[in-house]
């Protein structure tokens, strides 16, 4: 990684993308006395953590469940005085449509102890922000990795939720790195602290986007509805051209996946090669009213999470409000098939799909394949940090969970953008992480 030049004075930084990672890095930079402009193509902030209101209720379209591992998010919520509430209960709907509890055999059959020993031996830094530190050790396809280590009950206990959350099916060739990171972030593998008075999972009252709007409101320069047309990087700075005019800066932070920004970036051969290797999942959120379905819970559909052969069918749905039949449904697959397959799935469960309010498609979980991980793709991405005055945050270097992207973005800002001269102090972030201590 390149070190910043002339770090004594305030830097000017353009941040492209106003999702959680972009807003988190912008907040850190402003807190350290730097001048930041955030550019967002959409009309609102929050990225994949958007919320909408229907019938007087807030519905989250993407990320919103927080576990006891979400310490950075909890700190943000506390600092900004954002109200939280417990999440809905989790249930699995089996092939017959019966609601059952998720199997927790992994925590009781001795596999957890074997996993902890394996973790200590081969990937001890997996819980730290970022992925590069553990990528080579966990590059094998998840199914093969589970079989090689005799952790079949780990798949039984975490596979349904993993697939329902948009990360793929366990019979695909997705590397074990991502499955293990997900399992760690559930908070079930190791006891964690009670956060914000919640003994279990929690979320934001009134929609998760409330938090990101609050973050954006305290920043000095957030511009929504602005399309970046090109990024020009020079030895003396960066010029980000937009449909509203150019933005001059010392540095640019790309809070969107490299393959998404590539068409407007004056990319190097190395950047182009890495971008060409990025994969993502076509994941859909459908907000719709449906009657006759199990209520009051977050339901995982076992028949559609067990194998990639069921791709396109609904993998989960969330019924959050007792006085509303509106639910959020989640599925993979082709956009033109999602609604028709959802109608069939609801009917098969004994329900009826009523009004469809909206459908949102995400390029979810940007990641590298196993061969690329083994060959050091994430190390190569890390080596690009700061080069050509460019920094990368988001799901690709961090993993597509909001706590992971925020922690990685915060740590990047703290390590590489020291407080400007004359800045009294950063916000109180509490004790340094292990990763931060290694950098000092």
Show which residues each predicted segment covers.
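Conserved flavin/dinucleotide-binding core of flavoenzymes
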Residues: 3, 317-440
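N-terminal Rossmann-like FAD-binding beta1-loop-alpha1 element of flavoenzymes
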Residues: 11-38
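Glycine-rich FAD pyrophosphate-binding loop
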Residues: 30-53
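Glycine-rich active-site loop/strand segments that organize a redox cofactor
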Residues: 47-69, 121-133
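Mobile amphipathic helical/loop "lid" adjacent to a hydrophobic cofactor/ligand pocket
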Residues: 73-184
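Helical element adjacent to the flavin cofactor pocket in flavoenzyme catalytic cores
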Residues: 185-237, 242
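Mid-domain catalytic core of redox enzymes
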Residues: 229-341
């Amino acid at each position: 990684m390149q070190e910043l030049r002339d770090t004594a004075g305030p830097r000017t930084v353009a941040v492209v993308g106003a999702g959680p990672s972009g807003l988190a890095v912008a907040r850190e930079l402003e807190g350290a006395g730097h001048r930041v402009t955030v550019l967002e193509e959409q009309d609102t902030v929050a990225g994949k953590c958007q919320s909408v209101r229907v019938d007087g209720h807030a519905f989250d379209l993407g990320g919103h469940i927080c576990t006891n591992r979400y310490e950075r998010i909890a700190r943000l919520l506390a600092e900004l005085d954002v109200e939280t509430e417990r999440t809905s209960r989790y249930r699995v709907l089996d092939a017959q449509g019966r609601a059952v509890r998720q199997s927790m055999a992994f925590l009781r059959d001795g596999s957890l102890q074997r996993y902890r020993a394996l973790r200590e031996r081969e990937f001890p830094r997996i819980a730290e922000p970022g992925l590069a530190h553990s990528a080579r050790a966990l590059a094998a396809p998840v199914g093969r990795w589970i079989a090689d280590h005799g952790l079949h009950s780990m798949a039984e206990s975490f596979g349904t939720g993993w697939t329902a959350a948009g990360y793929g099916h366990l019979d695909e060739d997705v590397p074990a790195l991502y499955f293990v990171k997900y399992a760690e972030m559930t908070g079930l593998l190791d006891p964690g602290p009670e956060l914000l008075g919640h003994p279990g999972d929690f979320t934001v009252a009134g929609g998760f986007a409330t938090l990101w709007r609050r973050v954006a409101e305290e920043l000095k320069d957030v511009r929504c509805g602005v399309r970046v047309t090109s990024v020009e990087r020079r030895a003396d700075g960066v010029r980000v051209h937009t449909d509203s005019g150019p933005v001059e800066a010392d540095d640019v932070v790309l809070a969107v996946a490299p393959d998404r920004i590539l068409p407007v970036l004056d990319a190097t051969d190395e950047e182009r090669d890495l971008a060409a290797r990025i994969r993502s999942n076509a994941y859909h959120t459908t907000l719709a009213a449906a009657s006759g379905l199990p209520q009051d819970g977050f339901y995982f559909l076992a028949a559609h999470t067990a194998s990639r052969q069921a791709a396109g069918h609904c993998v989960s749905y969330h019924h959050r409000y007792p006085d509303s039949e509106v639910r959020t449904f989640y599925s993979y697959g082709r956009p033109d098939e999602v609604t028709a397959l959802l109608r069939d799935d609801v009917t098969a469960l004994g329900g009826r799909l009523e009004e469809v309010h909206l459908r949102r498609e995400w390029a979810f979980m940007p990641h590298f394949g196993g061969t690329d991980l083994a060959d050091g793709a994430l190390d190569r991405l890390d080596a690009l940090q700061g080069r050509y005055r460019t920094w990368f945050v988001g799901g690709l270097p961090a993993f597509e969970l909001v706590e992971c992207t925020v922690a990685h973005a915060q740590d990047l800002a703290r390590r590489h953008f020291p407080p400007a001269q004359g800045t009294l102090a950063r916000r109180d972030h509490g004790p340094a992480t292990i990763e931060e201590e290694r950098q000092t």
